[in-house]
Swiss-Prot record:
It comes from Alkalilimnicola ehrlichii (strain ATCC BAA-1101 / DSM 17681 / MLHE-1). The gene is tatA. Belongs to the TatA/E family. It holds the Pfam family TatA_B_E. This is Sec-independent protein translocase protein TatA. The chain crosses the membrane at residues 1-21. It is a single-pass membrane protein. It is found in: Cell inner membrane. One of its GO terms (cellular component) is TAT protein transport complex. GO terms for biological process: protein transport by the Tat complex.
Length: 90
C-alpha cells in the first residue's frame, strides 16, 4: 500500500502550482549550493586533519616526563586577583 505513481504525479503537480517554477528553481539552486558548500568543508576538514597528524604529534602521544617528588617545576597559570575587601571595616 505504498504511493502509486499517479498519486506522486498529482502531488508534484499541486506543489508546482502552489510554488511556481521560478521559486522551485531558486530553492533547488540554494539547496545545491548548500550541499556543495557542505561537501567542500568536509573535504577541507579531512585534509586539515591529515596534515595536522603528519606535522606534529599530539602532546598526549609523547611519553610523560619524570615527575619530581618535591613538587618543584610545577606552574599554575592564571591571574592574581586582589584579596576581597571587608565591607564592614570602620
Amino acid at each position: 500500500m505504498g504511493i502509486s505513481p499517479w498519486t506522486l504525479l498529482i502531488v508534484l503537480l499541486i506543489v508546482l502550482l502552489v510554488f511556481g517554477t521560478k521559486k522551485l528553481r531558486n530553492m533547488g539552486t540554494d539547496m545545491g549550493g548548500a550541499i556543495k558548500g557542505f561537501k567542500d568543508a568536509m573535504k577541507e576538514g579531512e585534509e586539515g586533519a591529515k596534515e595536522g597528524e603528519k606535522s606534529e604529534p599530539s602532546k598526549l602521544e609523547q611519553p610523560p616526563e619524570e615527575e619530581k617528588e618535591s613538587g618543584e617545576g610545577h606552574t599554575i597559570e592564571g591571574e592574581r586577583s586582589e584579596q576581597p575587601r571587608d565591607r564592614h571595616s570602620s
